[in-house]
Amino acid sequence: IMIQLLDKIHHKDSKNFFLIAGPCAIEGEEMAFEIAEKIVKLSDKYKIPYIFKGSFKKANRSRVDSFTGIGDEKALEIIKKVGEHFNIPTTTDIHENAHAELAASYGVDVLQIPAFLVRQTDLVVAAAKTGKAVTLKKGQFLSPESMKFAVQKVLDSGNDKVAIIERGNSFGYTDLVVDFRGIPTMQNYAPVILDV
């Protein structure tokens, strides 16, 4: 399983579920450290492997005047400091090809491809070519079977550290519903992480 490949993961032999958690967006160092510290304490108490997640840039906002971040390098530096201070792996989502190498240069361990961008070949390949682990959020518009193509793009780029994140399918216009029947199908292609 991909979690075993992350050097800094604590409690990887606990046979417990693992947790990816953190602030939606990096808004400042103090908040990021406070969140990470609390989750690390809980993950140590309950022997839960933990990966810190924070978006350095929220590029997929509904409105043009919505908060998108504090600056790419500033936010990535905070993610790097959190990972180093707590000796934990980190993940962030990327939205442009250049973000893959940028995030990797700050030591991010796992590059996440957002659901709306999971079919963007150049972005997926750019993430894969960094050699970092790649998580592919299943688009709410995709069937489980179609995720094999996104996974194959990572594999064809010479990277076997890939997992799928299931986050649900569109149910009406604004709701998402997880169809658990698709998880075994996607497990044929890569490990599956449930985003709840």
Q: Language-model segments: what does each one mean?
A:
Residues I48-S55, P89-I94, L194-V196:
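Short beta-strand segments at enzyme active-site cores
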Residues E37-Y46, D65-T91, A126-A133, G182-V192:
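Alpha-helix-loop-beta-strand connector modules within alpha/beta enzyme cores
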Residues P23-A32, Y50-D72:
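Glycine-rich, proline-tolerant flexible connector loops at the mouths of alpha/beta enzymes
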Residues T130-V196:
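Catalytic alpha/beta core domains of metabolic enzymes, predominantly
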Residues I1-I20, E77:
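N-terminal amphipathic alpha-helix/helix-capping segment at the start of soluble metabolic enzymes
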Residues I70-G71, H85-A100, D109-D122, A133-P144, ...:
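Catalytic beta/alpha-barrel core
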